[in-house]
Curated annotation (Swiss-Prot):
Residues 152-162 have a biased composition (Basic and acidic residues). Its main location: membrane. The gene is tmem35a. The chain crosses the membrane at residues 6-26, 62-82, 89-109, 115-131. The keyword Transmembrane helix applies. InterPro entries: TMEM35A/B. This is Novel acetylcholine receptor chaperone.
Amino acid sequence: MASPRTVTIVALSVTLGLFFVFMGTIKLTPRLSKDAYSEMKRAYKSYVKALPALKKIGISSVFLRKAIGSLELACGIVLTLVPGRPKDVANFILLLLVLIVLFFHQLVGDPLKRYAHALVFGILLTCRLLVSRQPEEEFPEKKLSRGNNGAHSREPIKMKVS
């Protein structure tokens, strides 16, 4: 049976991965939702207007939207399908992207309802990263029941109380 930690990591990975695949796709193409795509275009234009330094270094709203959308799509696929350490790397990249997007929302003065989803998914990404970095814990009854060569031992538990 899978440990609660494993179930939590898998559930968060799949859910977050699919969400970011969806959001990245919306930023890249109008095929899923024309309204959401046009809203993303408008939002990224306002982000570049609010931060003139981006324009000075040659980053247009189209490039910014496509870069963030591509990263979200790629990291979402990794988070959903790829096992092991790459999931943690994708999780970290997505967490940085969420922080950047939250910065942009604050910069243009968006109300909380416009970026509440980014806050929630940032918290979920943080939780997934923290849970995945925890070492696997062995339950005390399993430790006690194993003696030499896997035989069951009946030694009492000794606890030091200070």
